[in-house]
Amino acid sequence: MGKYLLAFAVIAAFGSLESLAQDASLQPPVYDCHRAVGKIRIDGRVGDKEWAGAVPCSDFRDIRGAGYAAPKYLTTMRMLWDDDNLYISAVLEEPDVKAQVKVRDDIVYHDNDFEVFLNPYGDSVLYYEYETNALGTVMDLLMDKPYSQGGTYIMTWDFPGLKSAVKVQGTLNRSNDTDKGWSVEIMIPFNALSRGGADPRTFKEWRANFSRVEWLTKPEENWVWSPTGVVDIHIPDKWGIIRFVD
């Protein structure tokens, strides 16, 4: 009987360690978003010197967290801010850059894409979503609350004053060569994120997440900054934290 109890104890301990590892993998990452030193030109060229002072975020991971393979391709994401705007850049490693969706607010994630989710008020309720593909086609929307709380997406909403641009390092929709990837720059005015007259700049910490949908297989791969533990990014209380610093 003793050896069976010992075996059970070992299995239970292993399960506990596995659970702890999963819990640790779901701890929200924190990004210190620094003030921009100079003017940022939104042209998709992330190598510009104005991004030199922005620290890259931690590596993207599988949306499910620990125990799943690391993303096949690297994503380097940075953020900056000034008095008026939030700036986001991403460099996406991609050996075969492809995109088909061309119409604004069509379903961009049917292509490989880059996605931004912002909850400026830190309440894990109302949030904003931005997506783009390598053609620079934008899909943006407002969620009044998460789907799990009966939320509805408002596709007719657009970011007022949004600017974004994409640059392909290679060739688009040509699979007989090898590309480096593509990059995106985004400018979101703070006043586009105001809610009920409240200024989002008064909140020093935001909830946020960033994602890549990658069609290496079916179903697709989902690579994110802050894993949620399941294949569902619409869980704001599992997102990472942006801290605004001077």
Predicted regions and their residues:
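Bacterial N-terminal signal peptides
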Residues: 7-16
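Positively charged n-region of N-terminal signal peptides that target proteins for export
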Residues: 1-4
